[in-house]
Amino acid sequence: QHAPVVIVGHSLGANAALLVGYELGKQGIPVDLVVTVDPTSSRPISPVVKRYLNIYLPGDGFGAKLAATGSGVDNDDIRNNPELNRPGVNHFTMDENPVVLKQIFDAIMPIVKAPGQKGAAKGRKG
């Protein structure tokens, strides 16, 4: 069994997260979760990635909906969330917004916590 692989990025870093997930999939390395916050690109999408969480704001010149749909792709348009659809939440601030950070945390924690484990799994350095 492999250690969980979770990739998170914002803006151009989100584009890089998509690319890294895709390339790892091509190498046969399973990716548990790719989280993108307002990516400027909608692909590449890998069928090997178990889940994508894309939090985006379309129409601001940055945010893109991921090109794939299905049970493994969650496109979350923040205009549909009353806690986020408000002045001051934009491409440059959304990655620090507590609501967005909680979404990311809630997506990651079930992956990195083993059943019955009280704390998060320890990350590897390197």
Positions of PLM-derived features:
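Lipolytic serine-hydrolase domain surface
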Residues: 47-126
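Serine-dependent carboxylesterase/thioesterase catalytic core
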Residues: 1-69
